Amino acid sequence: DNTLQDILIRFKRMSGYNVVWIPGTDHAGIATQVKVEEQLAKEEGKTRYDIGREEFLKRVWAWKEKYGNRIEQQVRRLGSSCDWSRKRFTMDDICARAVREVFVALYEKGLIYQGHRITNWCPHCHTALSDIEVDHKDEAGHLWYVKYPVIGEDDYIMIATTRPETIMGDTAVAVNPNDERMKKYIGKKVLVPLVNREVEVIADDYVDIEFGTGAVKITPAHDPNDFEMGERHNLESIMIMNLDGTMNAAAGKEYDGMTLKECRKAVIADLEKLGLLDHVEELNHAVGHCSRCKTTVEPLSTKQWFVKMKPLAEEALAAVDRGDTKFIPGRFTKIYDHWLENIQDWCISRQLWWGHQIPVWYCDDCGEVSASRTDLTECPHCHSKHIHQDPDVLDTWFSSALWPFSTMGWPDKTPDLQHFFPTSVLVTGYDIIFFWVARMMFATCEFMKKVPFKDVFIHGLVRDSQGRKMSKSLGNGIDPLEVSDMYGADALRFTLVTGNTPGNDMRFYMERVEANRNFANKIWNASKFVIMNLEDYDPEFVPTTDDFTLADRWILTSFNQVVHQVTKGLDSYELGDAAATVYDFTWNSFCDWYIELAKQRLYKSDDKRSRQTAQYVLVRVLTGALALLHPFMPFVTEHLWQHLPHEGESLIVAPWPTVDEALDFAEDAATMNIMMEAVKAIRNMRAEANVPMGKKAPVTLVPSDEAMAEVLHTYETYFKTLAFVDEVHILKTTDAKPENAVVTVVPRIEVYLLLKDLIDIEKETARVAKEQEKTRGEIERLEKKLSNKGFTDKAPEAVVAKEKEKLAAYREKAEALNKRMEDLKHL
């Protein structure tokens, strides 16, 4: 995430923009509090209640100072070019002031209220949780089928439930109005087992006809869907659990004080005794767990603070619909729209001590509730001194939602807000579009009357090499600092971006980090070569067009193309493609081709002007390539750039490369590409013939036209340098062609390689024959395997596909061996 942001920041800074990237962190309410509570229990054997709120918060701040800087260390180590003088923390004074202003303003508009709703409740942490703080895991469970007697009839309605321990809180049974089997029960009264409560059978479209029997028990106080149904049908809500997860008196005296597991066991036994348990089925279902303490989460109806979301969501939806903010990739717009169109009120209170304490005071004398931007010492209504502040804190996401403007000093009208707001782009993961992106949108639209950002660039998650989410439990996480120490921050950054496509997850392979470390070494070595050959470099020398060789013109034209492609890729957030483009150019075009050709003029040429021209092109292209690479690999590029001829103090603020039309030679570049094809053809023929590396071969080239003939005569040394050739013969199309040679054709050139004196033909023929026999055997084996219905029908599709790929590869190899054998016969 930080790497992608930094790439964009560096690119825009070099492109001449006045950029600002404000670093910072949120206070991670429950995560931080749980860590400190664990430390307190481990070191002192105490709970937070033992030491009190004030002392506990001192411990949290101390822990934050000690451990909270690790994220900053990682961000700095990876080279993020933030403005560290602007660092923000959601609990600092500037952000805290904005939090209070927003809370009170929404409260005064009637958009914040207190009420009872179902929330995710952690019985261990004793707090409500946001959905993102709940991990859902598939667990083996059961579906119990229970009979609810119909009052006044010798009949019963059968319900199916995964939670028999909540039966005592039932206030209705529900069926789908379109279920023909159940229509006869609608409106009738049934008895809730164990508590003998009379409840009505109601009709609601929410009920799934296919689930269980088609009839479900409704427990409004202990299930979010039941709560919504209870609201629609005005049902009573009976809380049968305590906040610590034990049963209370409302569950019945025989269950009062039991844990949930104990209660479930007792309820099942009692139902069996009464003959009301019909049967049990095994069932796998998702169970929510607190992401911090791993305790099973309970849906409980508790008194909390809420934000009315529908009025706020309207403008956040409209802004995206108008195009004021756009998602990249665009498919995430649908996800954003779906969440906001179906939004529920947001529970913003948490029963924690670490966080922004809710700015609401209760009067113990007159009972009034007052929200205030400043701390109150007396009741604004009756002036009583007997007041107390709400002990709960705000959801961490509440302060994070204000980040685009709170960090710039709002509610004051600061120069930063005037100059840098709204921001250009938000870079974030798809997993927090609702939790963070949508909330920043509605908060900013409400208080700034503008969108917070123009673009939302969505990236995926980094997974391990097997595609699993990284987690402590799996032990598959990576420490960016450790990887950076092993391979360098540049290699890690380049790995994270080249494996990234917008909106998609990426698999992390340490081998790719190592490969990108090798790329950094390649850049280093190429730069060192150039630097060592600049002792007589003249920065005032500017070659004319006539001074450029074919290779010069090709590399300058290629560089123009790469500048265009990389700039376009970064502008369109195709960061992975942009990185791959500059990688290919730097490694292949510049290092493997151009530098090798430039060596002739640097080492052997007595022509000073030719040497100066080579130096000019090397410096121009290398410094340009380092500039293109800089957003991706800032450390190595900055270091090398400083040792090359340059203007300005630092690469980080150097101008971004632009296309130079005066140095664009498309026709010459196309000709050079043909020359390169011919070189690669010679290399391939040598490899196929097993010509030893040390042996040079004579080559004959037959150009198809006079223009190409002139090029070949002028640059025949390219073949000697790059293709292990000692003699180059250039023939006309009317000349007799060489005998005893292998031939291949590239555009505008026939290439003949004389092999007779370079290989032992008899020995090579025997080797190829043996390889042919082995290949035929593999083809027969695979054909037999794939014709076996037992294999193709039973084996996984991926395995069958893999075997088909092998067969295709062996058939291709057989064709190549047959051609090789024919070539040997003619030598």
Please give the residue ranges for each predicted region:
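N-terminal catalytic cores of NTP/NDP-binding nucleotidyl/phosphoryl-transfer enzymes
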Residues: D1-V36, V99, A160-T161, T166, ...
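Short acidic, glycine-rich loop/turn motifs
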Residues: Y148-D154, P177, L191-N196, C363-D365, ...
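Feature 926 captures the class I aminoacyl-tRNA synthetase adenylation module centered on the KMSKS loop
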Residues: Y145, H338-F398, L402, E446-A489, ...
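Extended active-site and interfacial segments that coordinate phosphate-rich ligands
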Residues: N2-T3, I157-P193, V216-D223, H233-M239, ...
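Conserved oxyanion/phosphate-binding beta-strand-loop segments in alpha/beta enzyme cores
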Residues: E37-A41, V60-Q74, D179-Y206, N234-L235, ...
